[in-house]
Amino acid sequence: MLIREITDVIERFAPLAWQESYDNAGLIVGRPDDEVRKALLAVDVTDEVMAEAEREGCDLIITHHPIVFHALKRFNSADQVQRCVERAIRSGIALYACHTNLDSAPEGMSWRLAEMLGVADLRVLQPSVADAKVGFGVVGELPGAVATVEFMRHIQRTLGVRVVRHSDIASPEVRRVAVCTGAGASMIGEARRAGADIYITADMKYNDFMTPDKALTVADIGHFESEYCAIQILFDILSKNLITFAVRKSESSRNPVNYLV
């Protein structure tokens, strides 16, 4: 199957036009008319993921994070990014990323995470100016009020999160939940204005936990943990629309952050 036939399916769900201006989603290594037989899905392209692709005969790796994000001036295997790009070219493995366009797509990243946690009646938290159905984050309702601490333990159990960093508990119970996968500290204000009892995101800094008037609880579940659902979203898109194309979920895609607890 041609790469363009595969990426066309993904981009019908999450068009590249929806990515942020700073992003580098799309085909990074390879040509649209290259023929591929099997895709590997991962959060990041790493040495381990490259080895798995070679071992399993995958000639296309589709990730959430683009391996080339900042401009590269040379390829001399000095770091993992350079090694993986060089290895992909030598091995004939194409690299494709579906990043902020998947974040902002309806039924995309935040939608999936919220649904996994039992949050319903979802709407976009920060709509795009061009299209109110597109944007970052979601806010919705739980079927009933849940103790705040118990809901955070529910997050741990459901997502396999080892550590939840959180602010002071603003309310003993939560009903309205805001979610933004990845780094979402900049949207605390939107979550507050949406009337959320708790805001679930990642990459929070020290001062981010000092929410004004303690109006809501903010919970940092980890960047990788919040975005691991990208693999399943991409798998669902491809397996539903390309039933004869082989797709594998990576067993080597792992969190680069380690915890000593």
Residue ranges and their predicted role:
Residues 1-261:
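Active-site catalytic microenvironments in core metabolic enzymes, especially phosphate/sugar-handling
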